[in-house]
Regions:
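Ligand-binding loop in jelly-roll beta-barrel domains
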Residues: 110-135
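Membrane-topology and secretion signals of cell-surface/extracellular proteins
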Residues: 30-35, 52, 70, 90, ...
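Short acidic-glycine-tyrosine-enriched beta hairpin
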Residues: 64, 93-111
């Protein structure tokens, strides 16, 4: 009987400590923080969506080695780019933009040809979400 009483007291003590922790966790609020929102791309071009095919969302991780440069290209669908790590130089004609870790930008599907170069001393890691369509390429190299 004594063992049972000790076990019962232990169970009540443990649950009285842990139960408030669970209630506290449930009372914490979920926070939604907008990171980027625009109706235009990096070069000021309006964003539009492909209407001729089934919509398709794409999510990529892109790794650009130190000193590497992408081919000159365009995008037929709008995209959001987050530079998670590294430093980039984004060149569109005479317009040059520089980005560092934790910065983001939007590419319009109506934008001009451009290229991106890793100007940092570590591989650049980008996360890209494209609002595209089935069968539509993400990038068109020139």
């Amino acid at each position: 009987m004594r063992k049972f009483r000790n076990l019962l007291i232990s169970a009540i003590t443990i649950s009285s400590v842990l139960l408030p922790l669970e209630i506290t966790k449930a009372q914490e609020k979920i926070e939604v923080i907008p990171l980027i929102q625009s109706t235009k791309g990096l070069g000021g071009e309006k964003i539009s969506y492909p209407r001729w095919k089934q919509a398709e969302l794409r999510f990529f991780k892109v790794i650009i080695p130190v000193g590497a440069k992408t081919p000159t290209h365009t995008h037929p669908a709008p995209m959001v780019v987050l530079l998670a790590k590294g430093e980039l130089k984004h060149t569109r004609g005479d317009v040059i933009n520089y980005f560092s870790s934790k910065q983001s930008f939007i590419e319009s599907n109506n934008g001009d040809e451009h290229f991106v170069e890793n100007i940092g001393n570590e591989p650049a890691i980008l996360y890209v979400v494209a609002a595209s369509a089935v069968g539509l390429p993400t990038t068109v190299n020139k």
